[in-house]
Design a protein with these regions (language model features):
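Short, contiguous alpha-helical
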Residues: 7, 25-75, 102-103, 116-150
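Terminal targeting/low-complexity segments that flank the catalytic cores of oxidoreductases
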Residues: 1-6
């Protein structure tokens, strides 16, 4: 089982979630530049990432090899209009999805971590690498939010 991954996700949700809750609604809505995402949209993108990876992680438990479609992040963010949603609502959804992902990855058998997964046209990667990549992606975008832009 991959409890180290789950623990890392829980730690991120706890520490970053507390910081994000201090961000005022108007600050979360402000775009740093016309072509960039506001904090709400960056966090919404992380909701989309959690939702896509939830499906990938569960399906990996049920199969021997997987091919997943890629997702077009800008279109997902635009379609869901995260900028018009409440900061608290997006934050609650992000927190809940990631707590569940932590619960899920805690239960992935070690033997499944070497399973090959393909996402779109990207080269295959193991489930373990996919989980690690998810965590790096999460940390990267949370740092963007903290720095004030996307």
């Amino acid at each position: 089982m991959s409890t180290a991954f789950g623990e890392r996700i829980r730690q991120i949700v706890s520490s970053e979630g507390a910081r994000l809750r201090l961000v005022p609604e108007n600050t979360a809505s402000r775009k740093p530049a016309a072509e960039t995402w506001c904090k709400k949209e960056v966090l919404g993108h992380l909701v989309d990432s959690a939702a896509n990876n939830h499906q990938r992680f569960v399906r990996a438990l049920l199969a021997d090899e997987l091919l997943f479609p890629a997702y077009v992040q800008n279109e997902w963010v635009r379609a869901q209009e995260y900028a018009g949603e409440s900061w608290e609502g997006i934050l609650d959804l992000w927190s809940a999805l990631n707590r569940h992902l932590a619960h899920l990855v805690d239960r992935i058998p070690a033997a499944k971590l070497s399973m090959q997964c393909r996402i779109g046209e990207n080269p295959p990667m193991t489930l373990e690498a996919l989980i690690g990549d998810y965590i790096r992606h999460l940390v990267h975008h949370l740092a963007q939010i903290e720095a004030g832009g996307a």
